[in-house]
Protein backbone atom coordinates (compact mmCIF):
# COMPACT_ATOMS: atom_id res chain seq x y z
CA UNK A 1 0.00 0.00 0.00
CA UNK A 2 1.53 3.29 -1.11
CA UNK A 3 1.53 6.10 1.46
CA UNK A 4 0.42 9.37 -0.19
CA UNK A 5 2.75 12.37 -0.30
CA UNK A 6 1.60 15.95 -0.69
CA UNK A 7 4.43 18.41 -1.23
CA UNK A 8 4.30 22.19 -1.43
CA UNK A 9 6.55 23.90 -3.97
CA UNK A 10 6.77 27.49 -2.78
CA UNK A 11 8.70 28.58 -5.90
CA UNK A 12 10.10 32.14 -5.68
CA UNK A 13 7.98 33.21 -2.73
CA UNK A 14 8.78 33.90 0.89
CA UNK A 15 10.22 36.07 3.64
CA UNK A 16 11.28 35.30 7.20
CA UNK A 17 7.89 36.48 8.45
CA UNK A 18 5.98 34.51 5.83
CA UNK A 19 7.90 31.28 6.56
CA UNK A 20 7.29 31.47 10.31
CA UNK A 21 3.63 32.38 9.89
CA UNK A 22 2.86 29.81 7.17
CA UNK A 23 4.58 26.92 8.96
CA UNK A 24 2.90 27.83 12.26
CA UNK A 25 -0.49 27.83 10.53
CA UNK A 26 0.29 24.56 8.75
CA UNK A 27 1.10 22.94 12.07
CA UNK A 28 -2.30 23.97 13.41
CA UNK A 29 -4.20 22.94 10.28
CA UNK A 30 -2.47 19.54 10.05
CA UNK A 31 -2.82 18.51 13.68
CA UNK A 32 -3.85 14.86 13.81
CA UNK A 33 -3.06 14.13 10.16
CA UNK A 34 -1.12 10.87 9.99
CA UNK A 35 -2.30 9.14 6.82
CA UNK A 36 -0.42 11.38 4.40
CA UNK A 37 3.23 12.43 4.28
CA UNK A 38 3.71 16.19 4.02
CA UNK A 39 6.72 18.09 2.72
CA UNK A 40 7.42 21.71 1.82
CA UNK A 41 10.09 23.14 -0.47
CA UNK A 42 10.78 26.77 0.41
CA UNK A 43 13.46 28.81 -1.37
CA UNK A 44 16.89 27.52 -0.30
CA UNK A 45 17.76 30.36 2.05
CA UNK A 46 14.63 29.65 4.10
CA UNK A 47 14.99 25.86 4.44
CA UNK A 48 16.74 26.06 7.80
CA UNK A 49 14.24 28.60 9.13
CA UNK A 50 11.34 26.40 7.98
CA UNK A 51 12.97 23.34 9.55
CA UNK A 52 13.19 25.09 12.91
CA UNK A 53 9.60 26.32 12.61
CA UNK A 54 8.43 22.78 11.78
CA UNK A 55 10.48 21.06 14.52
CA UNK A 56 8.47 18.43 16.37
CA UNK A 57 5.81 18.21 13.65
CA UNK A 58 5.37 15.71 10.82
CA UNK A 59 6.21 18.34 8.19
CA UNK A 60 9.30 17.35 6.20
CA UNK A 61 11.59 19.66 4.28
CA UNK A 62 12.55 19.69 0.64
CA UNK A 63 14.20 21.88 -1.96
CA UNK A 64 13.29 23.10 -5.43
CA UNK A 65 16.48 22.16 -7.27
CA UNK A 66 20.02 20.82 -6.86
CA UNK A 67 23.30 21.05 -8.74
CA UNK A 68 24.88 17.87 -10.07
CA UNK A 69 28.27 18.83 -8.56
CA UNK A 70 29.03 18.21 -4.89
CA UNK A 71 31.58 21.04 -4.49
CA UNK A 72 33.93 23.28 -6.40
CA UNK A 73 33.96 26.39 -8.55
CA UNK A 74 30.27 26.49 -9.43
CA UNK A 75 29.10 29.96 -8.45
CA UNK A 76 25.51 30.25 -7.30
CA UNK A 77 24.85 26.51 -7.06
CA UNK A 78 23.73 24.31 -4.15
CA UNK A 79 24.89 20.72 -3.78
CA UNK A 80 23.08 17.59 -2.63
CA UNK A 81 25.49 17.37 0.31
CA UNK A 82 24.51 20.90 1.40
CA UNK A 83 20.80 20.14 1.14
CA UNK A 84 21.29 16.96 3.13
CA UNK A 85 23.33 18.84 5.74
CA UNK A 86 20.62 21.47 6.21
CA UNK A 87 17.85 18.88 6.56
CA UNK A 88 16.11 18.80 3.17
CA UNK A 89 15.00 15.31 2.09
CA UNK A 90 12.64 15.66 -0.90
CA UNK A 91 14.39 17.40 -3.79
CA UNK A 92 12.43 18.55 -6.84
CA UNK A 93 14.24 18.06 -10.15
CA UNK A 94 13.12 18.55 -13.72
CA UNK A 95 10.33 21.00 -12.95
CA UNK A 96 8.95 22.42 -16.18
CA UNK A 97 10.04 25.91 -15.15
CA UNK A 98 13.64 24.65 -14.88
CA UNK A 99 13.35 22.82 -18.20
CA UNK A 100 11.88 25.91 -19.90
CA UNK A 101 13.72 28.88 -18.37
CA UNK A 102 17.07 27.19 -17.68
CA UNK A 103 17.07 24.82 -20.68
CA UNK A 104 17.64 21.76 -18.47
CA UNK A 105 17.79 18.59 -20.55
CA UNK A 106 16.54 15.10 -19.73
CA UNK A 107 20.18 13.99 -19.51
CA UNK A 108 21.12 16.70 -16.99
CA UNK A 109 18.06 15.91 -14.88
CA UNK A 110 18.95 12.20 -14.89
CA UNK A 111 22.42 13.08 -13.57
CA UNK A 112 20.83 15.12 -10.77
CA UNK A 113 18.61 12.12 -9.98
CA UNK A 114 21.72 9.93 -9.62
CA UNK A 115 23.50 12.43 -7.36
CA UNK A 116 20.48 12.66 -5.05
CA UNK A 117 20.20 8.87 -4.79
CA UNK A 118 23.92 8.61 -3.98
CA UNK A 119 23.43 11.08 -1.12
CA UNK A 120 20.43 9.24 0.30
CA UNK A 121 18.00 12.00 -0.68
CA UNK A 122 14.61 11.52 -2.36
CA UNK A 123 14.36 12.77 -5.94
CA UNK A 124 10.98 14.20 -6.91
CA UNK A 125 11.27 13.80 -10.68
CA UNK A 126 8.90 16.08 -12.57
CA UNK A 127 7.78 14.91 -15.99
CA UNK A 128 5.04 16.04 -18.34
CA UNK A 129 4.08 17.36 -21.72
CA UNK A 130 3.51 20.85 -23.10
CA UNK A 131 0.18 21.96 -24.53
CA UNK A 132 1.44 21.45 -28.09
CA UNK A 133 2.67 17.94 -27.25
CA UNK A 134 -0.64 17.16 -25.58
CA UNK A 135 -2.64 18.33 -28.58
CA UNK A 136 -0.38 16.28 -30.88
CA UNK A 137 -1.14 13.14 -28.87
CA UNK A 138 2.44 12.85 -27.61
CA UNK A 139 1.76 12.75 -23.85
CA UNK A 140 2.84 9.13 -23.38
CA UNK A 141 5.82 9.51 -25.71
CA UNK A 142 7.14 12.50 -23.76
CA UNK A 143 6.62 10.92 -20.34
CA UNK A 144 8.30 7.69 -21.48
CA UNK A 145 11.29 9.60 -22.85
CA UNK A 146 11.76 11.56 -19.62
CA UNK A 147 11.56 8.38 -17.50
CA UNK A 148 13.75 6.35 -19.86
CA UNK A 149 16.67 8.75 -19.41
CA UNK A 150 16.84 7.55 -15.80
CA UNK A 151 15.93 3.92 -16.54
CA UNK A 152 18.60 3.51 -19.22
CA UNK A 153 21.41 5.04 -17.15
CA UNK A 154 20.52 3.85 -13.65
CA UNK A 155 18.05 0.98 -14.03
CA UNK A 156 14.62 0.49 -12.50
CA UNK A 157 16.16 0.08 -9.04
CA UNK A 158 16.87 3.83 -9.04
CA UNK A 159 13.14 4.45 -8.67
CA UNK A 160 12.97 2.55 -5.39
CA UNK A 161 12.08 5.14 -2.76
CA UNK A 162 11.88 7.89 -5.39
CA UNK A 163 8.91 10.08 -6.32
CA UNK A 164 7.60 10.98 -9.77
CA UNK A 165 5.44 14.07 -10.24
CA UNK A 166 3.38 14.14 -13.42
CA UNK A 167 2.84 17.79 -14.26
CA UNK A 168 1.11 18.54 -17.54
CA UNK A 169 2.90 21.78 -18.40
CA UNK A 170 -0.27 23.29 -19.85
CA UNK A 171 -1.95 23.00 -16.44
CA UNK A 172 0.74 24.62 -14.26
CA UNK A 173 -0.27 27.98 -12.88
CA UNK A 174 -2.95 28.33 -15.54
CA UNK A 175 -5.95 27.29 -13.49
CA UNK A 176 -6.48 24.48 -15.99
CA UNK A 177 -6.26 20.92 -14.73
CA UNK A 178 -6.40 17.53 -16.36
CA UNK A 179 -9.64 15.76 -15.50
CA UNK A 180 -9.22 13.03 -12.88
CA UNK A 181 -9.73 10.42 -15.62
CA UNK A 182 -7.10 12.05 -17.86
CA UNK A 183 -4.61 12.27 -15.01
CA UNK A 184 -5.26 8.67 -13.95
CA UNK A 185 -4.67 7.42 -17.49
CA UNK A 186 -1.23 9.06 -17.60
CA UNK A 187 -0.33 7.91 -14.07
CA UNK A 188 -1.26 4.35 -15.01
CA UNK A 189 0.85 4.63 -18.16
CA UNK A 190 3.83 5.82 -16.10
CA UNK A 191 3.47 2.95 -13.63
CA UNK A 192 3.00 0.40 -16.43
CA UNK A 193 6.05 1.79 -18.26
CA UNK A 194 8.28 1.30 -15.21
CA UNK A 195 6.70 -2.13 -14.65
CA UNK A 196 8.16 -3.28 -17.97
CA UNK A 197 11.54 -3.01 -16.23
CA UNK A 198 10.49 -3.98 -12.69
CA UNK A 199 6.89 -4.62 -11.63
CA UNK A 200 7.62 -4.58 -7.90
CA UNK A 201 9.28 -1.17 -7.98
CA UNK A 202 6.56 0.20 -10.28
CA UNK A 203 3.91 -0.83 -7.78
CA UNK A 204 5.55 1.00 -4.86
CA UNK A 205 6.76 4.19 -6.60
CA UNK A 206 4.87 7.31 -5.52
CA UNK A 207 3.39 9.18 -8.50
CA UNK A 208 2.09 12.64 -7.63
CA UNK A 209 -0.10 14.85 -9.78
CA UNK A 210 1.19 18.37 -10.27
CA UNK A 211 -1.14 20.38 -12.49
CA UNK A 212 -3.09 23.11 -10.67
CA UNK A 213 -4.18 20.98 -7.72
CA UNK A 214 -6.48 22.92 -5.41
CA UNK A 215 -8.99 22.44 -2.62
CA UNK A 216 -11.87 21.93 -5.05
CA UNK A 217 -10.38 19.22 -7.29
CA UNK A 218 -8.10 17.36 -4.85
CA UNK A 219 -10.56 14.76 -3.54
CA UNK A 220 -11.62 13.62 -7.00
CA UNK A 221 -8.01 13.39 -8.19
CA UNK A 222 -6.91 11.37 -5.16
CA UNK A 223 -9.79 8.93 -5.61
CA UNK A 224 -7.93 7.62 -8.67
CA UNK A 225 -5.94 4.44 -7.95
CA UNK A 226 -2.60 5.55 -9.41
CA UNK A 227 -2.54 9.13 -8.07
CA UNK A 228 -0.53 9.02 -4.85
CA UNK A 229 -0.61 12.65 -3.78
CA UNK A 230 0.26 16.01 -5.27
CA UNK A 231 3.02 18.48 -5.96
CA UNK A 232 1.24 21.71 -5.12
CA UNK A 233 2.24 25.19 -6.28
CA UNK A 234 0.12 28.25 -5.52
CA UNK A 235 -2.22 26.52 -3.06
CA UNK A 236 0.76 25.56 -0.87
CA UNK A 237 1.23 29.22 0.08
CA UNK A 238 -2.08 29.21 1.97
CA UNK A 239 -2.18 26.96 5.02
CA UNK A 240 -5.92 26.31 4.90
CA UNK A 241 -5.97 25.45 1.17
CA UNK A 242 -2.89 23.22 1.47
CA UNK A 243 -4.37 21.44 4.49
CA UNK A 244 -7.57 20.65 2.56
CA UNK A 245 -5.44 18.96 -0.12
CA UNK A 246 -3.46 16.97 2.46
CA UNK A 247 -6.63 15.84 4.25
CA UNK A 248 -8.23 14.88 0.93
CA UNK A 249 -5.25 12.64 0.16
CA UNK A 250 -5.42 11.08 3.60
CA UNK A 251 -9.17 10.42 3.32
CA UNK A 252 -9.00 9.03 -0.23
CA UNK A 253 -6.24 6.57 0.51
CA UNK A 254 -7.87 5.35 3.72
CA UNK A 255 -11.20 4.74 1.99
Curated annotation (Swiss-Prot):
Principal subcellular localization: cytoplasm
Binding locations of substrate: 9-11, 173, 212, 233-234
Molecular function terms, GO-annotated: triose-phosphate isomerase activity
Keyword Isomerase among record annotations: yes
Gene3D superfamilies xref list: Aldolase class I
Signal peptide stretch: none
Class of enzymatic activity (EC top level): isomerase
Subcellular location as annotated: Cytoplasm
Gene Ontology cellular component terms for the protein in this record: cytosol
Alphabetical GO biological process terms: gluconeogenesis; glyceraldehyde-3-phosphate biosynthetic process; glycerol catabolic process; glycolytic process
Pfam families per UniProt: TIM
SUPFAM superfamilies hit by this protein: Triosephosphate isomerase (TIM) (SSF51351)
Listed PROSITE patterns: TIM_1, TIM_2
EC number in record: 5.3.1.1
Keywords for this protein: Cytoplasm, Gluconeogenesis, Glycolysis, Isomerase
Active site: 95, 167
Spans through the membrane: none
Pathway: Carbohydrate biosynthesis; gluconeogenesis; Carbohydrate degradation; glycolysis; D-glyceraldehyde 3-phosphate from glycerone phosphate: step 1/1
Catalytic activity, as annotated: D-glyceraldehyde 3-phosphate = dihydroxyacetone phosphate
HAMAP family per UniProt: TIM_B
Function: Involved in the gluconeogenesis. Catalyzes stereospecifically the conversion of dihydroxyacetone phosphate (DHAP) to D-glyceraldehyde-3-phosphate (G3P).
PANTHER family according to UniProt: TRIOSEPHOSPHATE ISOMERASE
Entry's family note: Belongs to the triosephosphate isomerase family.
Subunit structure: Homodimer.
UniProt-recorded name of the protein: Triosephosphate isomerase
Organism: Salmonella typhi
Amino acid sequence: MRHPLVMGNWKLNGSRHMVNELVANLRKELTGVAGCDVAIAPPEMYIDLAKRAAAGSHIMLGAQNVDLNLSGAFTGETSAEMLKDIGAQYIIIGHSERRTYHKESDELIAKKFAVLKEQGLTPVLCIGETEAENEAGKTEEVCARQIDTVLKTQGAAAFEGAVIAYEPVWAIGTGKSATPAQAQAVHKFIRDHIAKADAKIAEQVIIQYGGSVNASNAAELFAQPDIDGALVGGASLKADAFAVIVKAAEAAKQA
